[in-house]
Amino acid sequence: MLTAPLYAVALVALAAPVASAAPPGGAADLSWDVTTVDADQSFRGLDAVDRDTAWVSGASVSGGDARVYLTKDGGDSWDDVSPAGSAGLNFRDVEAENARTATVLAIGEGEASRIYRTTDGGATWIETFRNTEPTAFYNCMDFFPGGKRGLAVSDPVAGKFRIISTDDGGQSWEVLPDAGMPDSTGEANFSASGDCLTISGRDAWFGSGGAKSRIFHSTDQGLTWAATDSTIPAGEAAGVFGLAFKNPRQGIAVGGDFAAAADGVDASATTRDGKSWTNGGDLAHLGEDAAYLRRSVVVVGESGPVGGSSVSTDGGQTWRQFSEVGFHTLDCTNDGACWAAGGRGRVGTL
């Protein structure tokens, strides 16, 4: 439920190259090629299938329809493949199997939290979940390898985070029992990037903020969870915003404080066993999302007066800012492509 403010922007047509963001400080090895897809949208959902195919999702800053876009040519062109009747919704997460099959999550209180699924590249969508619990607010989702079992996490209901699961690729969802979920007081998820929940192998993790900044870990596909304090600051607008794992043991959490977005101190944490977390290097900007790119880790952040993109080559112990251009969400692929998306309908590729 803890979300960053959207940015006011003007409408721009489908993707034409806008700018190439040169990295400062001599970091000439990485640079964003930035494209505007739809400037009425703030993109916080992104799933990159490979260097050719990517899906992005967002919300209108002018009160119009929430949109989902798909590219199959490396970002040269984008198709509007949005579900019908999406006015007022906020598509904060999209998870794709390929160019035809994808699942998108709309966030919000009560019935605003919904899940849609397509198997024909967005030509048609089926609503497969609509929240009926007034106090629930779903923030992000992910799928286990194979694409059948998936999880989505909501802010606490009756003092515990709520998890829904699917075993048929998102065609149907059920609320899981909360007996295996630790108690939570004053915590919530940040739907900053669509990656407040992430999966690697059979393990799943999600982050929290608010009264505590914790990372919850499940080794049984979401049935039971253990909570560990992170080293990322807690606060009303502070906590863990995004998680990424190279494998079930090696991962990174990023976050910060939206109320002091220029402060990247203690904004990253790392794990070497999937369970315990240690303080990573300070960032020069807020960390909203992270992804592994070959032997490096990339972090992006856009919210607040200072945005940027940084890279680490030592597993998150030290960071080097390579661009003053920031984004809300990030995804890198097995074939070495890296995609990012953010406010004003922008998409970047490395």
Give names to the regions the model predicted.
Residues 1-22:
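Secretory targeting and sorting signals
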